[in-house]
Amino acid sequence: MSSESTVIKVTGKSAADNYDVVVGRGLLGRLPELLGERVKRVLVIHPRALRLTGDTVRDELASAGFTALTAEIPDAEEGKHIQVAAFCWQVLGQNDFTRSDAVVAVGGGAVTDLAGFVAATWLRGVKVIHMPTSLLGMVDASVGGKTGINTAEGKNLVGAFHPPAAVLADLDTLSTLPKNELISGMAEVIKCGFIADPAILDLVEKDPSAVTDPQSAFLRELIERAIAVKADVVSEDLKETGRREILNYGHTLGHAIELVERYSWRHGAAVSVGMMFAAELARSVGRLSDADADRHRTILETLGLPITYRRDRWQGLLDGMRRDKKSRGDLLRFVVLDGIARPGILDVPDTSLLFAAYQEIAS
């Protein structure tokens, strides 16, 4: 197994949008250098479940000469609320954080979303470095500069684009994850295979059991490929004005499921069902072949990801999809495939088409 780190670069229209995603093991020691000499104060935001990890990061920074503090927030989606952001702002204010200081996010995707939002809004923007500890956080939430919190009306409806200064994806942290969380995170990896990199699908089909082994070089390759897909798309379209929409494959229905379930479903599980729905929708209008639609079902099922959802929840899902950020007026828009690695947009003026596709995944 390689001990070398892999650096995947994200570039933008300005130097401020450029940053590195470092994938490797034992990366904590790189954090002080990435923060830089101008930073004096650092707030480490972490969930309750990672208190010891957060304290370790704080102590590492303190030993390097920083004034380091921690802010403990609720686990998972419970942490993505305005009240939690306000608590973090209070800590920053009470400790005299300036524009030259920084925030470090330690945790899964919900933590990087919240910490990024806090950094984006404090003094109109301070440096943030993400240290994702989940598979989902590594391949999705920490890369791309999207930040956000949830409201009663939907997921991530309040947020900002705020690229991190760096991302440290330390693979050692994956060893602490339950198997079902690794499997859930694989949904975002598989998504990258469907929309851009078919080699991801080939690798998963070759050895699906290896995706639950956090020590395997196989899983590392999948992670690096998925990050490379996202880095490529984000480098071209930071603020989702065009191509970046393809990263929302499976997310229109997926976010609606999360809303209906009051965020009790894992994000990856919801996206898995959403991708299956998008495949059936594309098949129904003749844009995706039977073979490619069936490949969705086979790969997702093989990994143990869900591909069906409750038949009696359709109206709630439709209401949730109407709030999707891709919608334009009363027109619902979906990312669909015209083939593997050939994403496109489907505008749906008639919800009966959606209902018919939903019947193919309803249980």
UniProtKB/Swiss-Prot annotation:
GO biological process: amino acid biosynthetic process; aromatic amino acid family biosynthetic process; chorismate biosynthetic process
Binding locations of Zn(2+): 188, 251, 267
Entry keyword annotation includes Kinase: no
EC number: 4.2.3.4
Alphabetized Gene3D superfamilies for the sequence: 3.40.50.1970, Dehydroquinate synthase-like - alpha domain (1.20.1090.10)
Main location: cytoplasm
Note on cofactor: Binds 1 divalent metal cation per subunit. Can use either Co(2+) or Zn(2+).
The protein's required cofactors: Co(2+); Zn(2+); NAD(+)
Keywords: Amino-acid biosynthesis, Aromatic amino acid biosynthesis, Cobalt, Cytoplasm, Lyase, Metal-binding, NAD, Nucleotide-binding, Zinc
GO molecular function, one term: 3-dehydroquinate synthase activity
Pathway, per record: Metabolic intermediate biosynthesis; chorismate biosynthesis; chorismate from D-erythrose 4-phosphate and phosphoenolpyruvate: step 2/7
Catalytic activity: 7-phospho-2-dehydro-3-deoxy-D-arabino-heptonate = 3-dehydroquinate + phosphate
Keyword check for Cell inner membrane: no
Pfam families per UniProt: DHQ_synthase (PF01761), DHQS_C (PF24621)
One of the record's GO cellular component terms: cytoplasm
Binding site residues for NAD(+): 75-80, 109-113, 133-134, 146, 155, 173-176
Subcellular locations according to the entry: Cytoplasm
InterPro entries noted in UniProt: Dehydroquinate_synthase, DHQ_synth_AroB, DHQ_synth_fam, DHQS/DOIS_N, DHQS_C
Its biological purpose: Catalyzes the conversion of 3-deoxy-D-arabino-heptulosonate 7-phosphate (DAHP) to dehydroquinate (DHQ).
Similarity section: Belongs to the sugar phosphate cyclases superfamily. Dehydroquinate synthase family.
Name of protein: 3-dehydroquinate synthase
Protein source organism: Arthrobacter sp. (strain FB24)
